[in-house]
Amino acid sequence: MNSKSRITAIGTHVPNQILSNNDLEKMIDTNDEWIVQRTGMKERRIASEDEYSSNLAIKAVENLCTTYKKNLEDVDCIIVATTTADYVFPSVACQIQQYFNIPHTMAFDLNATCAGFTYGLHVGNSLITSGSHKKVLVVATETLSKVTDYTDRTTCILFGDGAGAILLERDENKPSFIAYHMGTNGHGGIHLYRTNLSTTMNDTPLQTNEKIVQNGREVYKWATRTVPVGIKELLHTANMKMDDIDWFIPHSANLRMIESICEKSQIPIHKTLTSVEYMGNTSSVSIPLALDLARKKGKLNNGDTLLLYGFGGGLTHLGLIVEWDLS
């Protein structure tokens, strides 16, 4: 893979409010043991009523700046991965541009659901490698609690809120990106959706309360079948073996799903980083949260080779192999 960009900084933010399994017991017919057994989740963070995806995104970028120690005025592209933008338009990316007063930049949102962060990294790397841009800010931000049906016990136990940001800069000598693999199965879109204008999909009537609707069984089957094949293809493209990978960071959809993917891909679970236990499923945000949690715990070292894999609604997926080096 011809890459000329490097990951140079990371920042994250989660809301203060915690929604525990015990809290959910008071809202729906469920219990802590049932949730942990099926998902591995104990807590998730929930945005306040007047806190939106743009607010979380801005705080994640501010957190990035505490370690980056430089200003962002020369950022020439802002990419925001989100399914829960404050508005249909303007984009969250434009709100970030306004807040940080970045003078000359392209700014747009992309919607690839839980694969949004890896999509954003891939697009950002491609823009820099092409020579059209030099510094790209990639942000993932979600307030899924605002579109979660808290009467549906199969979905409301899953989702949480948060934001993560990564900075990409042109560096031909120490590029981060090694390989990518991606794919889409639009036929499976009916299994995970949230309505907007249309009330049907491929002539099938939809639930139209604008909340997340998921056929968990079908999504599980697709992910545990598709992602292991994608990992194999990704390693083949990079001319690597799993032994060459220091850390596997999948989308933190559900711990049981991750365990199945690891088993089928022969990935030791101790080489896997997630944010699922105390953050829940934060869609596009789960991978940067897992990365930053590991960084803060001292697990990530400069020179580590990481395999990131996002997958979700669409149905769509994208995996990346990158070298981690913030030096």
Swiss-Prot record:
| SUPFAM superfamilies, sorted | Thiolase-like
Q: Which UniProt keywords apply?
A: Acyltransferase, Cytoplasm, Fatty acid biosynthesis, Fatty acid metabolism, Lipid biosynthesis, Lipid metabolism, Multifunctional enzyme, Transferase
Catalytic activity field: malonyl-[ACP] + acetyl-CoA + H(+) = 3-oxobutanoyl-[ACP] + CO2 + CoA
* Stored PANTHER family: 3-OXOACYL-[ACYL-CARRIER-PROTEIN] SYNTHASE 3, BETA-KETOACYL-[ACYL-CARRIER-PROTEIN] SYNTHASE III
| Annotated S-S bridges | none
* Family membership: Belongs to the thiolase-like superfamily. FabH family.
Where is this protein localized, as stated in its record?
A: Cytoplasm
- HAMAP family from the UniProt entry: FabH
Q: List, alphabetically, the Gene3D superfamilies matched.
A: 3.40.47.10
From the UniProt record, give the pathway where this protein acts: Lipid metabolism; fatty acid biosynthesis
- What is this protein's function? Catalyzes the condensation reaction of fatty acid synthesis by the addition to an acyl acceptor of two carbons from malonyl-ACP. Catalyzes the first condensation reaction which initiates fatty acid synthesis and may therefore play a role in governing the total rate of fatty acid production. Possesses both acetoacetyl-ACP synthase and acetyl transacylase activities. Its substrate specificity determines the biosynthesis of branched-chain and/or straight-chain of fatty acids.
TM spans (from-to): none
Question: Which Pfam families has this protein been placed in?
Answer: ACP_syn_III, ACP_syn_III_C
Annotated protein name in UniProt: Beta-ketoacyl-[acyl-carrier-protein] synthase III 2
| InterPro entries assigned to the protein according to its UniProt record, in alphabetical order | ACP_syn_III_C (IPR013747), ACP_syn_III_N (IPR013751), FabH (IPR004655), Thiolase-like (IPR016039)
Q: What is known of its domains?
A: The last Arg residue of the ACP-binding site is essential for the weak association between ACP/AcpP and FabH.
An MF annotation (GO) of this entry: 3-oxoacyl-[acyl-carrier-protein] synthase activity
Q: Which residues form the active site?
A: 114, 251, 281
- List, in alphabetical order, the GO biological process terms annotated in this UniProt record: fatty acid biosynthetic process; secondary metabolite biosynthetic process
State which Enzyme Commission number(s) the record gives.
2.3.1.180
GO cellular component assignments: cytoplasm
What's the source species' lineage? Answer: Bacteria, Bacillati, Bacillota, Bacilli, Bacillales
Q: Where is this region: ACP-binding?
A: 252-256
Listed under subunit, the entry gives: Homodimer.
Primary localisation category = cytoplasm
